[in-house]
Amino acid sequence: EITEIDNQRITTTNVQACYSKLIKPSSPTSIKVKDKDGKVYTINSGPIYANPIIHHQVNEKIGYLVYSAFESGFDQELFDVFKEFKSQNITELILDLRYNGGGDVTSANLISSCIAGDLCIDKTFASYRYNDERMKVLGNQRPIQKFAYSQYDNLSTSLSAGGLNLRKIYCLVTDDSASASELVINALRGIDIEVILIGTTTHGKNVGMEGVELTAGTDKYLLFPITFQAYNAKGFGDFENGFTPDYEINENKPNGEYFEGYGDFGAESDPLYAKAISLISGNEVTTPTRAVNQAKEQMLVIATPRLNRIGMIK
């Protein structure tokens, strides 16, 4: 039971104001909570930085990575995963971008460069088209960004320690796979790395944003207008309708009936993961038609509410 917010006792007359303060705090918030035994705890609000590396594992030379957002603040942790994959000599990779709405272009370059390894040296990761006025200043030449394998500036290092040199990967996708997630798919296909898509059609966001700071009086604003469209090394960038899966599986209705959830990430009760495993092994993996009825108390809900799509940010 929540009894106080910012030292203000909750009453029937102020409950709505307290609720608003709780869900949309304008300043640090302190709350008091009383448990069933009457013991009172004080909880202070603070920033939480969620690690986008949700899960990773290696099983029989197959690497599996669940990545929820391209957050450059966690690039070291991401690179460490690829170094682990390389140290275990994986030969196959399942990249799970089902709930990844995008993020930093730099992190998309990191993950793409580690996947490609030596195959991407001195090759184009992406080129960018801006509006007509800006393109005139650039001589109507799209600026090119190389794969960062040889030198990744955000970590001030080469990515060779995590380079996998893979010519094919399996990517799990949904409509929530957007922007920088699609940039990775497009960039790898641009250098002839086969990206097998399993799931449903991706969102279709081939444009990105740049941050602009504005000041109005004493107020400061940080805006992120859409300013560019991204293309791969082959000049392809028209994926505004999304990428169509090679193997279409709706994770909510894989067998024609609604699935409430699956087991842990990397479990073969997950039909998308199971399909990737079957394609790699050549053996069909059967997923239960009623996973929701099995050990329901242990369920990890996969069919999450739609996440905010944070876009492709330079």
Language-model segments: which ranges?
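Conserved PDZ fold ligand-binding element
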Residues: E1-Q16
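C-terminal "post-core" interaction segments
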Residues: I62-L65, A69-D80, E84-E92, G101-K314
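A broad structural signal for short, well-ordered beta-strand segments within beta-sheet-rich domains
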Residues: I2, A50-I54, S87, L166
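Solvent-exposed coil/turn segments that connect beta secondary-structure elements
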Residues: N7-Q8, K36-G38, G46-I48, S68-F70, ...
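PDZ-domain C-terminal substructure recognizer with occasional recognition of PDZ-binding tails
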Residues: A17-H56
